[in-house]
Design a protein with these regions (language model features):
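A short, N-terminal "cap"/entry segment at the start of jelly-roll beta-barrel domains
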Residues: 2-6, 15, 19-69, 110-112, ...
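Short beta-strand His + acidic residue motifs that chelate non-heme Fe in jelly-roll/DSBH
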Residues: 83, 102-103, 121, 126-132
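Short, surface-exposed beta-edge/turn micro-motifs
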Residues: 8, 12-13, 89-90
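A short beta-loop-beta micro-motif enriched in histidine and acidic residues
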Residues: 63-67, 79-95
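A short, acidic/glycine-rich surface segment
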Residues: 55-59, 78-82, 127-130
């Protein structure tokens, strides 16, 4: 059996993503630069498991030093994913249960994400998450 090509993988991924509910977004009147004073700088109550990955440099697209990862992250009540950047690695986050707040460099207020929703972490985003 032939391995799927990069295009097939990208198409399948886009179809799955298109069918998912979008997560909370920054209110239009709150889109603004946020210096994130007081941002969490250390993880707490977080289990991050990489379930699978694809080395994209070996695919037709030849994306050197890039991997497509499928991860499961569990954030305990009160747990935090510390401040980090998506300067060079976009991501999609799906909230499986509960609710979690995102504190973003692009929004003046916390963004609530609920179970069943997905959040897009786009290039240039700096943020941290907290399960309240």
């Amino acid at each position: 059996m032939k391995s799927p090509t990069f295009r097939q993988i990208a198409l399948a991924t886009s179809l799955v993503v298109a069918g998912l509910a979008h997560a909370g977004e920054c209110p239009a009147d709150k889109v603004a630069a946020n210096d994130l004073k007081g941002a969490a700088t250390a993880p707490g109550g977080v289990v991050d498991t990489e379930l699978a990955s694809i080395d994209l440099s070996k695919e037709n697209g030849k994306l050197d030093q890039r991997r497509l990862r499928l991860r499961q992250m569990t954030i305990a009540p009160g747990g935090v994913v510390p401040m980090h950047s998506h300067e060079d690695r976009p991501a999609l986050i799906m909230v499986n249960s509960g609710e979690v707040y995102e504190y973003s460099s692009k929004c003046a207020v916390p963004i609530l994400h609920k179970a069943g929703e997905t959040a897009r972490e786009s290039l240039g985003t700096k943020h941290w998450w907290k399960n309240t």
